[in-house]
Regions:
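N-terminal switch/interaction subdomains of large nucleotide-dependent motors and GTPases
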Residues: 1-168
């Protein structure tokens, strides 16, 4: 498994770099602020690390389970949803909001504005940079990366759908 870094160069990311790069993505999409912890994992993960006969890192498997799905649609006043939603509202990745059809106001998105939208101990802008770089280190193509972001913004926009009943 080989990846290029976020910068346009011929330098290859090592397998170790790729394994480490999974963390910002797992945290962005799996961690949220709860009443007790600003960066609480809302899913389980099992990481199996493989070594070759010489004791060198040869690969890893990550299995996720039990994602707290209800957190997407509702949060308590002192909590917030998954970090990625708040990261995507930051300017770190220049045209992200435009490409994902997001406004500049987090309060336009009911699913993610019911609780805290800012947390003093979390820098959403910096964390978005880490997440974006991690996608690149993990060999996501530009199209794949933007599809992930667009899917995430679609979830944010789903909270704005209104049901209308028609009587015939």
């Amino acid at each position: 498994m080989v990846a290029t870094s976020g910068k346009k160069s011929d330098k290859k990311a090592s397998l170790e770099d790729q394994i480490v790069a999974t963390n910002p993505i797992l945290e962005s999409y799996g961690n949220a602020k709860t009443s007790r912890n600003d960066n609480s994992s809302r899913f389980g993960k099992f990481i199996r690390i493989h070594f070759n006969a010489a004791g060198k890192l040869a690969g890893c498997d990550i299995e996720s389970y039990l994602l707290e799905k209800s957190r997407i649609t509702q949060q308590q006043e002192v909590e917030r949803s998954y970090h990625i939603f708040y990261q995507m509202m930051q300017p770190a990745v220049g045209d992200l909001k435009k490409k994902c059809l997001l406004s500049n106001d987090i309060y336009d998105y009911h699913y993610v504005s019911q609780g805290k939208t800012k947390v003093q101990s979390i820098d959403d802008n910096e964390d978005l940079e880490f997440t974006h770089e991690a996608f690149q280190v993990l060999c996501f193509s530009e199209e794949e990366m933007w599809n992930v972001y667009k899917g995430t913004s679609a979830v944010m926009n789903l909270g704005e759908l209104v049901s209308i009943k028609f009587h015939c």
